[in-house]
Amino acid sequence: MTEEHVVLLDEQDKPSGTLEKYAAHTLNTPLHLAFSCWLFNEDGQLLVTRRSLSKKAWPGVWTNSVCGHPQQGETTEEAIIRRCRFELGVEITDLTPVYPHFSYRATDPNGIVENEVCPVFAARATSVLQVNSEEVMDYQWSEFKSVWKSLLATPWAFSPWMVMQASDEQARERLLNYCQR
């Protein structure tokens, strides 16, 4: 995969340039565009992934299925499809926004800051996973309600963006409705 960049955003969340992804994630990360996607299988189970230990931010932490950054000139939907293929080796369908205006700022234990405008989507996996071990060290298909209980009981074991996304009542309801259809 070619070197990824992030799309930098101004105070009005409008694109203002790009920066190499690795250089962007520092102790003073500029605001940039990202996405988060929650994948479900045909049985309505959620794919929860554990970030590789080689990740710069939140290594080894459990998180939602796939996250990433749209490249300049790429739609969020195109970026989600690209990252699902790269990280999980999976094809998806029924890509649906569930929390389109999510944004957050969080600092990991190493001091690396995430500072993202990060629309959240749900999608359905349509093929068998072929996980990229440089991105994902473990994964599990689980019932959404079980994952929610785990997030409430042990939020420190999960990425802050996953906890924040699921903590939004409207987003949680949309995810629950999505997995039940």
Swiss-Prot record:
Superkingdom of origin: Bacteria
Associated pathway: Isoprenoid biosynthesis; dimethylallyl diphosphate biosynthesis; dimethylallyl diphosphate from isopentenyl diphosphate: step 1/1
A Pfam family hit: NUDIX
Cytoplasm among keywords: yes
Domain Nudix hydrolase as annotated: residue spans: 30-164
Active site: C67, E116
Catalytic activity: isopentenyl diphosphate = dimethylallyl diphosphate
Gene3D superfamilies to which the protein is assigned, alphabetical: Nucleoside Triphosphate Pyrophosphohydrolase
EC numbers on record: 5.3.3.2
Residues annotated as binding Mg(2+): C67, E87
This protein's record includes keyword Heme: no
Matches recorded under InterPro entries: Idi_bact, IsopentenylPP_isomerase_typ1, NUDIX_hydrolase-like_dom_sf, NUDIX_hydrolase_dom
Co-factor note (free text): Binds 1 Mg(2+) ion per subunit. The magnesium ion binds only when substrate is bound. Binds 1 Mn(2+) ion per subunit.
Disulfide bonds: none
Membrane-spanning intervals of the chain: none
GO MF annotation: an example: isopentenyl-diphosphate delta-isomerase activity
Residues binding Mn(2+): H25, H32, H69, E114, E116
GO CC terms in record: cytoplasm
Cofactor: Mg(2+); Mn(2+)
Keywords: Cytoplasm, Isomerase, Isoprene biosynthesis, Magnesium, Manganese, Metal-binding
Similarity field: Belongs to the IPP isomerase type 1 family.
Function of the molecule: Catalyzes the 1,3-allylic rearrangement of the homoallylic substrate isopentenyl (IPP) to its highly electrophilic allylic isomer, dimethylallyl diphosphate (DMAPP).
Assembly with partners or alone: Homodimer.
Protein name stated in the entry: Isopentenyl-diphosphate Delta-isomerase
Lineage, opening ranks: Bacteria, Pseudomonadati, Pseudomonadota, Gammaproteobacteria, Enterobacterales
Gene: idi
